[in-house]
Protein backbone atom coordinates (compact mmCIF):
# COMPACT_ATOMS: atom_id res chain seq x y z
CA UNK A 1 0.00 0.00 0.00
CA UNK A 2 1.43 3.39 -0.97
CA UNK A 3 1.07 6.22 1.55
CA UNK A 4 2.23 9.83 1.89
CA UNK A 5 3.90 10.50 5.24
CA UNK A 6 2.60 13.49 7.21
CA UNK A 7 5.30 13.22 9.87
CA UNK A 8 8.86 11.95 10.21
CA UNK A 9 8.76 8.27 11.09
CA UNK A 10 11.88 6.38 12.17
CA UNK A 11 13.13 3.77 9.69
CA UNK A 12 10.46 4.77 7.17
CA UNK A 13 10.86 8.33 5.88
CA UNK A 14 10.33 12.06 6.28
CA UNK A 15 7.40 14.41 5.78
CA UNK A 16 6.08 14.20 2.23
CA UNK A 17 7.76 10.95 1.27
CA UNK A 18 5.67 8.45 -0.67
CA UNK A 19 6.50 5.03 0.71
CA UNK A 20 5.17 1.54 0.25
CA UNK A 21 4.17 -0.17 3.50
CA UNK A 22 2.23 -3.29 4.38
CA UNK A 23 -1.52 -2.75 4.37
CA UNK A 24 -1.94 -3.71 8.03
CA UNK A 25 0.72 -1.24 9.19
CA UNK A 26 -1.00 1.52 7.24
CA UNK A 27 -4.55 0.65 8.35
CA UNK A 28 -3.77 -0.07 12.00
CA UNK A 29 -1.06 2.46 12.81
CA UNK A 30 -0.21 5.15 10.25
CA UNK A 31 -3.70 6.15 9.10
CA UNK A 32 -5.52 6.14 12.51
CA UNK A 33 -2.76 8.21 14.15
CA UNK A 34 -2.78 10.75 11.33
CA UNK A 35 0.84 10.05 10.40
CA UNK A 36 0.03 9.23 6.77
CA UNK A 37 -2.65 9.37 4.07
CA UNK A 38 -3.28 6.97 1.21
CA UNK A 39 -1.30 8.04 -1.88
CA UNK A 40 -3.92 8.76 -4.54
CA UNK A 41 -4.15 11.69 -6.96
CA UNK A 42 -6.57 13.68 -4.79
CA UNK A 43 -4.54 13.26 -1.59
CA UNK A 44 -1.33 14.25 -3.40
CA UNK A 45 -2.93 17.57 -4.40
CA UNK A 46 -4.30 18.15 -0.89
CA UNK A 47 -0.90 17.35 0.63
CA UNK A 48 0.97 19.73 -1.68
CA UNK A 49 -1.47 22.49 -0.67
CA UNK A 50 -0.85 21.79 3.05
CA UNK A 51 2.90 21.06 2.81
CA UNK A 52 4.07 24.42 4.24
CA UNK A 53 1.62 24.17 7.15
CA UNK A 54 2.75 20.61 7.97
CA UNK A 55 6.44 21.56 7.76
CA UNK A 56 5.85 24.50 10.13
CA UNK A 57 4.04 22.20 12.59
CA UNK A 58 6.88 19.68 12.40
CA UNK A 59 9.45 22.42 13.06
CA UNK A 60 7.41 23.71 16.03
CA UNK A 61 7.20 20.19 17.50
CA UNK A 62 10.95 19.77 17.09
CA UNK A 63 11.65 23.11 18.81
CA UNK A 64 9.31 22.24 21.69
CA UNK A 65 11.00 18.86 22.12
CA UNK A 66 14.46 20.49 22.11
CA UNK A 67 13.29 22.95 24.78
CA UNK A 68 11.99 20.09 26.95
CA UNK A 69 15.28 18.23 26.44
CA UNK A 70 17.23 21.22 27.78
CA UNK A 71 14.95 21.39 30.84
CA UNK A 72 15.37 17.66 31.48
CA UNK A 73 19.16 17.88 31.13
CA UNK A 74 19.17 20.78 33.60
CA UNK A 75 17.32 18.76 36.26
CA UNK A 76 19.20 17.51 39.27
CA UNK A 77 18.94 13.79 39.93
CA UNK A 78 15.32 12.71 40.28
CA UNK A 79 14.90 10.69 43.49
CA UNK A 80 12.51 7.74 43.58
CA UNK A 81 11.91 5.94 46.87
CA UNK A 82 10.98 2.26 46.81
CA UNK A 83 10.91 -0.58 49.31
CA UNK A 84 14.13 -2.55 49.22
CA UNK A 85 15.87 -5.41 51.00
CA UNK A 86 19.17 -5.32 52.88
CA UNK A 87 21.42 -5.69 49.83
CA UNK A 88 19.70 -2.89 47.90
CA UNK A 89 17.49 -5.17 45.84
CA UNK A 90 14.02 -3.69 45.35
CA UNK A 91 10.92 -5.64 46.33
CA UNK A 92 9.30 -4.40 43.15
CA UNK A 93 10.82 -2.43 40.33
CA UNK A 94 11.01 1.13 39.05
CA UNK A 95 9.52 1.29 35.57
CA UNK A 96 8.82 3.85 32.90
CA UNK A 97 5.65 5.14 34.58
CA UNK A 98 7.47 5.75 37.89
CA UNK A 99 10.26 7.65 36.15
CA UNK A 100 7.83 9.70 34.05
CA UNK A 101 5.77 10.59 37.15
CA UNK A 102 8.90 11.62 39.09
CA UNK A 103 10.17 13.85 36.27
CA UNK A 104 6.71 15.41 35.87
CA UNK A 105 6.62 16.07 39.62
CA UNK A 106 10.03 17.75 39.28
CA UNK A 107 8.51 20.24 36.86
CA UNK A 108 9.05 18.90 33.32
CA UNK A 109 6.19 17.16 31.53
CA UNK A 110 7.18 13.63 30.46
CA UNK A 111 5.06 10.75 29.15
CA UNK A 112 5.89 7.15 30.01
CA UNK A 113 6.15 6.29 26.30
CA UNK A 114 9.08 8.71 26.02
CA UNK A 115 11.18 6.89 28.65
CA UNK A 116 13.59 4.28 27.25
CA UNK A 117 14.71 1.40 29.45
CA UNK A 118 16.45 -1.00 27.03
CA UNK A 119 17.60 -3.32 29.83
CA UNK A 120 14.19 -3.40 31.52
CA UNK A 121 12.95 -1.93 34.76
CA UNK A 122 15.35 -0.79 37.50
CA UNK A 123 15.51 -3.47 40.22
CA UNK A 124 18.27 -2.19 42.52
CA UNK A 125 19.00 0.97 44.46
CA UNK A 126 21.58 3.35 43.08
CA UNK A 127 22.18 6.03 40.47
CA UNK A 128 21.08 5.48 36.87
CA UNK A 129 21.13 7.50 33.67
CA UNK A 130 17.89 6.93 31.78
CA UNK A 131 17.45 7.99 28.17
CA UNK A 132 14.27 9.80 27.16
CA UNK A 133 13.28 10.20 23.52
CA UNK A 134 11.14 13.31 23.19
CA UNK A 135 11.05 13.34 19.38
CA UNK A 136 12.46 11.15 16.62
CA UNK A 137 15.47 13.50 16.48
CA UNK A 138 15.65 14.66 20.12
CA UNK A 139 16.99 12.52 22.96
CA UNK A 140 18.04 13.49 26.45
CA UNK A 141 19.30 11.80 29.59
CA UNK A 142 17.74 12.12 33.03
CA UNK A 143 19.60 11.12 36.18
CA UNK A 144 17.52 8.84 38.41
CA UNK A 145 18.46 7.93 41.95
CA UNK A 146 16.60 4.99 43.46
CA UNK A 147 16.71 4.94 47.26
CA UNK A 148 15.29 2.53 49.83
CA UNK A 149 12.28 3.72 51.83
Swiss-Prot record:
GO biological process terms on file: translation
Keywords annotated in UniProt: Ribonucleoprotein, Ribosomal protein, RNA-binding, rRNA-binding
SUPFAM superfamilies: L9 N-domain-like, Ribosomal protein L9 C-domain
MF terms in GO: rRNA binding; structural constituent of ribosome
InterPro entries per record: Ribosomal_bL9, Ribosomal_bL9/RNase_H1_N, Ribosomal_bL9_bac/chp, Ribosomal_bL9_C, Ribosomal_bL9_C_sf, Ribosomal_bL9_N, Ribosomal_bL9_N_sf
Cystine residue pairs: none
GO CC terms of this entry: ribonucleoprotein complex; ribosome
Signal peptide residues on this chain, from the entry's feature table: none
Family as reported in the entry's similarity comment: Belongs to the bacterial ribosomal protein bL9 family.
Function: Binds to the 23S rRNA.
Protein's UniProt name: Large ribosomal subunit protein bL9
Organism per entry: Shewanella amazonensis (strain ATCC BAA-1098 / SB2B)
Gene name as annotated: rplI
Amino acid sequence: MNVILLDKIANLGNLGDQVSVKAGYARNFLLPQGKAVVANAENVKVFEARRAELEAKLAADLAAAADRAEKIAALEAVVIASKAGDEGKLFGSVGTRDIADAVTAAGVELAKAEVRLPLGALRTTGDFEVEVQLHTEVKSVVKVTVVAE
